[in-house]
Amino acid sequence: MASLQDIRRRIDSTKKTSQITSAMQMVSSSKLIQIQKHTSGYLDYANHVEAIVAHLAAAHLLEHQNGSSIPFITQRPVKTTAILVITSDRGLVGGYNNQVLKRTDQIMREQKLTKENAVIFALGGKGSDYYAKRGFTIAFENRDITDVPKFWEVSDLVKEVTKQYAARKFDALELVFNHFINRLKNDVVNQQILPIRSENFQRDEKGNLTADKYKGQSSIYEFEPAPESLLKIVLPQFAQSLLYGAILDAKTAEHAASASAMRAATDNAKDLISTLELKYNRARQAAITTEITEITGGMAALQ
């Protein structure tokens, strides 16, 4: 049985840990508020840009039903697939990283991806280390971004992705990250980013664009430069904006997961302290009772 001194030492140690996790929870909550303000403004902008680009691209594709020369919206045979995995650099975020890595492994099994036909782009050390140890090619990695990442911090990564896709280093890009829902919940999602696809690109059963709202659109606008030249410039930038938006979303989910994990750790520490204090009081009471019994027994022996 642990001594009173050992129990008291554990209580003091757990209280200090509780203070640390409580402080970390407050810090994560503060970071969450900051990034939510930044992300909400960016997503409003990105949604409007997406609608405009999708409209322009669909109108262009309607006039090029037999194929477009723009690689970012043209389907091609997939020989190599790239996966952009967004994780954190450190732990203390609950199941945040495990969810992403588990979904990525699932995608690889479903698409029969191996070290020979898949490459990894990694944002965050956990994902990069995980797949490097398994022998996958890490085409590019980015670590130690700030709590509210600016575009310039991740520009090397997102530009490298679009550069390698345009150079046909890979033929499709899957993105796997945690999508922020609320403070208590996030959901791991995966989506194909390249080639760019949109629900606005309505097609018939043969894969031909059929959306009436796009027919003749290019004829009622005057473009300078020509639509095809414009799309060749705009689409890589649009793909980069999609990636940046996902990074902000994932970072928001990371702060929420960290706050939730630290809150759970603080609650567990408080429960443990209550249990230890009860154990301490019982042990102390038993020690006092034993001491009284010994004194009483000694007095009886003297009589």
From Swiss-Prot:
It comes from the Bacteria. Disulfide bonds: none annotated. GO terms for molecular function: ATP binding; proton-transporting ATP synthase activity, rotational mechanism. It is found in: Cell membrane. The keyword Ion transport applies. The keyword Ion transport applies. Gene3D superfamilies: 3.40.1380.10, ATP synthase, gamma subunit, helix hairpin domain (1.10.287.80). GO terms for cellular component: plasma membrane; proton-transporting ATP synthase complex. CDD domains: F1-ATPase_gamma. It is a peripheral membrane protein. GO terms for biological process: proton motive force-driven plasma membrane ATP synthesis. Keywords: ATP synthesis, Cell membrane, CF(1), Hydrogen ion transport, Ion transport, Membrane, Transport. Belongs to the ATPase gamma chain family. Produces ATP from ADP in the presence of a proton gradient across the membrane. The gamma chain is believed to be important in regulating ATPase activity and the flow of protons through the CF(0) complex. F-type ATPases have 2 components, CF(1) - the catalytic core - and CF(0) - the membrane proton channel. CF(1) has five subunits: alpha(3), beta(3), gamma(1), delta(1), epsilon(1). CF(0) has three main subunits: a, b and c. This is ATP synthase gamma chain. The gene is atpG.
